[in-house]
Structure formats: C-alpha cells, structure tokens
Amino acid sequence: MLLISNVSVVVLTKNNQNTIEKTLNSLLDFEDVVVYDNGSTDETMNIVKKFPNVNLVQGEFKGFGWTKNKAASYSKNGWIMIIDSDEVVNRDLLEYLKNKNLKDDTVYRLNSNGYYKDIQVRYSGWTLTVKRLYNKKVTSFNNNDKVHEHVLSEGLKEEVLEGSINHYSYHSISEFIIKADRYSTLFATNNVGKKSSSPTKAFFNGMYSFFRTYILKQGFRDGYVGLIIAFSHAVTNFYKYIKLYELNKELKK
C-alpha cells in the first residue's frame, strides 16, 4: 500500500470513544497522524494508542483556532490536513491525494457530506466544502477564533479537491442539545464586550436561523431530520445572543 508521507493529519479529541476508531481507520494511509487530546475520561486514548501511525499528544484547549495550531506544531510535515474526530476520509480522496501535487500558495477545500446517525443529510446546509488542507509554513488558523474557526486564506488561492469526507456529527437529539450549549457559550465568551445583543436580537436571530435552514436551504427536503437541524440552529443562535446579552450586562456592573 502506497502511504501518504507528505501530509500530516491533525485530529482533536475529547471523549470521542464512539467515533474515533472509525476516523483513525480511515487514516491508515497516512504515515503521520497527530491526535491532540484535551482531557478525555472515556476510552478515547486507549483506542488511539492502538494505531501505530498516530502520535498522541495531551494538552489544553484554548478555543478551536489556537488548539488546532498547537496540535499542528507536533506534525512531521508542513502540509496539514484537519480532520474532526467524527469524520471519515473516503477512499476516493485518499487515492487523489497520493497523486496530487500540492502548491504552497493554495489552501485546499474538502467536500463534506453531513450525516445524522447513518442518514445522509443532503440539504439543510450540510453538504458543503471546508478549508482543511494547508501548509503551516504559509498560513494557519486564527488563534483568537474560539469557535467557527477557519484557515486564513487571504492572498492565497483556494481549490476544491476531488473526493470527500463523511461527517457523522450527531448520533442523537441529545447531542444537538449538548453542542448547542457548548457552542453558544464559546460564542458569548468570545464576543463579550465586543458585540452588542438584546433579547429581541436573540429572538430574531433564532427565528431567522430556522427560516434559513428549513426554507432557504431546503431542510424540509431532509424530512424529520431537516426539522431537527432547523430547530437546533434556531436554539443555538438564540442562546448565543441571549448568553452574550447576559455577559454584557455583567460586564457593565
């Protein structure tokens, strides 16, 4: 088997015992995989240690941007591909990478297919391209991005690679609730004192998020799953701005 030796994969983990093995099995074609764990208390690290091509690092979490840059610093290669701990790299992308001539002035996007349980979500904004492959000697993530982090690509070219990854981001409705609380808190703490908010703004942001996901992005075509996603987006955005409102009030005291 021809291994991919010029690209290092970086994966962040914390209590991902249900998904990490499937993720790492899809990365066996890479010689260098860095798993950066932030305090797992389940079987995640024991599972990770079974893979000979993985360098397991334990460290702190300071927001997604900073943490991904920190994890990338442990890689053997300049080229970094970011994969989430609930994603699977498909064979077509692996084979394409083995023959791809990567260019330093380009940030590469991956086609991402979203799944709820084992149901592919074809609408609702879940089929997209994401900036995941870059040369760390040229660019990086913004260290200040606590959530919704992205690779800085100003002044660089962007190219979508052939092939895809599957993103198994949610396996139950409870996970939507947990992530809504986590991401809304990260947003609020990252923007306290920087952005204004109000109960009215929180309400209308939530309502518009539902409309955008369910109608504009045709979430209704995903059946009941589309309804779950649309409501989750509404709740997340409502809590983002209502939490920010409360934190701003505390700041003024």
Language-model features: locations:
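Acidic helix N-cap motif at the loop->helix transition within catalytic regions
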Residues: 18-21, 42-50, 92-93
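Conserved donor nucleotide-binding strand/loop of the catalytic core
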Residues: 45-74
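Cell-envelope/extracellular polymer assembly enzymes that use nucleotide-activated donors
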Residues: 6-8
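Short, well-formed alpha-helical segments that are part of the catalytic scaffolds
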Residues: 10-29
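A conserved acidic beta->alpha catalytic loop
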Residues: 26, 37-46, 84
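Catalytic-site signature of metal-activated, phosphate-bearing donor transferases
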Residues: 66-72, 79, 83, 90-251
